[in-house]
């Protein structure tokens, strides 16, 4: 159906995807659209692709709704523990913004689990865009849907609501999120592997 589409189901590291796989498939540096949805190291892939000089006009990246702005979170690549689809996988909207904004991108929407960015020079085509991540997070996820990270005794939606109510106290918000992640690791049957995972 899409003769130029390339599907590669291997699990390369972000460096491989940024510097080898994309090059091997002759993806143009100024591609029109980039979609990242790997259920794990999404922001590591984004960093590698942008650092390699690729400049898509639009980017759609899956971002975990479990970590609301302004918290910054991402699972870091570790070749010894390539846990794709981990409950700790993913990247927060605020972390993605830190990565992509220096490359000249504007956030135009956050639709529950996907952040949509366009090059700054195209932002005017989308009308009056208010690119504040907190506002767009609330518009795109008004019920505070949170499918991962908060497991066991932690209800996803209520945990996100608790974090959102702590926005006025960043230290308390961060401490509560860290405590929640520790509880998720402790309650998980994958706790040995998760203890070895690195996240920011």
Language model: regions and residue ranges:
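Hydrophobic/aromatic beta-strand patches that form the interior of the parallel beta-sheet core
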Residues: 3-7, 59-60, 108
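Rossmann-like AdoMet/SAM-dependent catalytic core
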Residues: 20-25, 70-200
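Generic detector of contiguous secondary-structure segments
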Residues: 36, 41-52, 102-105
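Short, conserved beta-strand edge motifs with alternating hydrophobic and charged residues
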Residues: 35-37, 60-62, 110
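A short alpha/beta connector and helix-capping loop motif
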Residues: 44-82
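S-adenosyl-L-methionine
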Residues: 1-43
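Conserved hydrophobic/aromatic beta-strand scaffold that supports enzyme active sites
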Residues: 33, 58-60, 114-116
């Amino acid at each position: 159906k899409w003769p130029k589409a390339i599907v590669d189901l291997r699990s390369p590291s972000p460096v491989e995807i940024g510097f080898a796989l994309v090059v091997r498939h002759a993806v143009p540096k100024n591609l029109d659209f980039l979609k990242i949805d790997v259920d794990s190291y999404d922001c590591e892939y984004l960093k590698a692709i942008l650092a390699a000089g690729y400049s898509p006009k639009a980017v759609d990246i899956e971002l975990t709704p479990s970590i609301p702005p302004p918290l910054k979170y991402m699972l870091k690549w570790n070749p010894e523990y390539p846990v794709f689809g981990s409950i700790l996988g993913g990247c927060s909207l605020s972390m993605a913004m830190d990565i992509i904004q220096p490359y000249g991108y504007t956030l135009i929407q956050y639709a529950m689990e996907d952040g949509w960015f366009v090059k700054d020079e195209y932002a005017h085509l989308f009308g009056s865009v208010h690119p504040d991540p907190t506002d767009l997070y609330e518009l795109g996820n008004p019920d505070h849907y949170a499918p991962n990270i908060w497991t066991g005794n932690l209800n996803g939606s209520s945990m996100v609501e608790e974090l959102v109510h702590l926005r006025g106290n960043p230290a308390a918000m961060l401490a509560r999120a860290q405590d929640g992640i520790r509880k998720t690791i402790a309650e998980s049957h994958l706790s040995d592997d998760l203890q070895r995972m690195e996240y920011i």
